[in-house]
Every structure is written in structure tokens, then in C-alpha cells.
Amino acid sequence: MAGTKIELDVQSTGLVIVDMQVEGCERHGPGVKPVIANIRGLLDRFRAVNGKIIHVQSVRTKDHPEFTVFGRPYGLLLGSPGADFVEELRPLAGEEIVQKTSHDCFYKTSMEAVLEKLQLQACRDRIVVTGIGSSNCVYHAVIGFHIRNYTASCPKIAFMAFILSHNPSRCTNFVPMLTTSM
């Protein structure tokens, strides 16, 4: 699918950076570096105009069902180095962080309160979603915003999937793919 150029109004647009954490980025290997750089470019543009930025952080505790029920190896443990944001995309003081314990950045999180605090409104504002894991967490974020009546977009240069065959096909069915950052 060809990208769509969309002009963004920083006052009515939020940048959501999903799961750009050490552990996940290491799993994706060197191919993630251009994605990190492209997200950083968007982040710098939003920061330069005092834009609305939300960092989403996936964290777990040792009693999480992923480990206790499904037997997965421990990962993204709260407070562990792997759960930290990658250095290039670390939040600055005052930038919002939403911690989540599932693929969904809305389920049992502060996302709704953060959107209200930033005065981002459904049926009016656009959300630009970036990150890795487009077949999981980015996908669920886009769907979460979509079902809440936000216009959600994924810059095709600023997300990727662990299973490359899923990138970007899963998101293109639901949202416009931006060809430019802003």
C-alpha cells in the first residue's frame, strides 16, 4: 500500500511511542536501528514544538500469567535493565509514561487519564503510533485508539515487526501509512 502524506497539527496530534525498550529492541537485532533513528526524528520534532508525547512501557512482575500460567521465560521485569527505554528514546522530565502489563496500552493503564491530561480528544485529534512489534503491541495500540474514535496513523518508517512477514500488512488494513514524519 502506498503511503499517504498527512499534514499534522501539533496541537491536535499526539505521538505515542510503543515499547521502545532495551529487551525488545535487542530481540529485533540491527534492523531496529533505522526505526529507532526515525522515531527519534519524530520525537525531536514533537519536542521542538512542545508537542504531546506519550511513551508506552511494557512491564511485568514475576507473578504475571505469562510466566505462571503460560510458562514463558521471564522478561520485561519491572525495574530490570531490559525494561528500560532505549537510550535514544528515553523520556524527558515531564513527558508522559504509560506502563502496561499486556499488549493493550489501554487495559488497566493510565492511558485514558493521560489523553485527558494532554487534552487529546476522540473524534477530533490524531494519534501517531510508532514502535516495534507492529503485529502485537503497535497493532493493539492502533486498534485501541481506533475503537475510541481517534484518527490513528503509523509512519511506515517508524515501526517494525519481529515477524517480518507481518510488517506492515497488519496495520495497513486499519490506518493510513504516513510517508513523511511531519
Spell out what each predicted region is:
Residues H28-P34, F70-L76:
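Short glycine-enriched, charge-decorated loop/helix-capping segments at active-site entrances
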Residues M1-G14, G41-A48, Y74-M182:
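Active-site-adjacent betaalpha module
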Residues Q21-R27:
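Short acidic, Gly/Ser-rich segments with clustered Asp/Glu that frequently serve as metal-coordination loops
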Residues G29-R47:
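…and closely analogous acidic/polar surface helices at protein-protein or active-site interfaces
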Residues F46-P65:
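Von Willebrand factor
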Residues P65-V69, N167:
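Short aromatic-enriched loop/helix-cap "lid" or pocket-rim segments at secondary-structure transitions
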Residues E23, T61-K62, A161:
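Active-site loop signature of alpha/beta-hydrolase-fold enzymes
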Residues I17, Q21, H55, P155:
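Generic enzyme active-site microenvironment
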